[in-house]
Amino acid sequence: MIIPAEKRRRGSRLATAAAVLLFTIGCTATGFALWGNPPPPRPPASAAVSAPSPESVSATPLPEPISVPPTPRVDQVVGPTLTASEPTQINVPAIEVDSVLMQLGQNPDGTVQTPSLDEASPAGWYTGSPTPGAIGPSVIVGHVDSRVQGRAVFYRLGEMRPGDEILVTRADATVAVFVVDGVEEYPKDDFPQFAVYGNTDHAGLRLITCGGEFNEITRTYPDNVVVYASLVSSRAA
């Protein structure tokens, strides 16, 4: 259910960056599964989202906890929000993604867990972030490739453009409808934690996967592709 502004609680859940040492989504991927296939699509500069001077933090060594802005006051919240409910499925028509969502926690080194490389799907919701539709940036991650099926669930994430819809089905039988604000590709060693994980004044969503040219020597992708989206409405599942 959408919460009217006057009923939104001041003490909303802190964004991901407030609680844990997050920096990038792990990009030690298979690569070999894409041999003979073109590299994953990359977002053009025109698809970039504007962010006010985000703080960039090195991925290695582990960064110190970063500071986040105060949780927005009730009268500062922008747009609709939903009561908390865990996500169960994601649908992205523009890139033909329809995936159940697993739950992902945190690795000992502070990085976000990722789905198994042995499967192209599913994507996963990071449980340390708000549920989709709540105030703050909800985080959903997925692989770009896999060991057994080549292209994985977020292989085409770089194709997304502002205005594309993202539909997230939740456990309370509602569908949260998000619209893409922008798409960015960041080097792992210059990842803007504040812009991606910091508190927001609206119900946001981040879709994240690996990106850039696969390095045959290190067997890794050097970048992360991040899709920024905002909640615009909800409906019954």
Regions inferred by a protein language model and the residue ranges of each:
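Terminal targeting segments of Actinobacterial cell-envelope proteins
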Residues: 1-15, 40-42
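Solvent-exposed, non-transmembrane regions of membrane-associated and secreted proteins
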Residues: 29-159, 170-172, 182-237
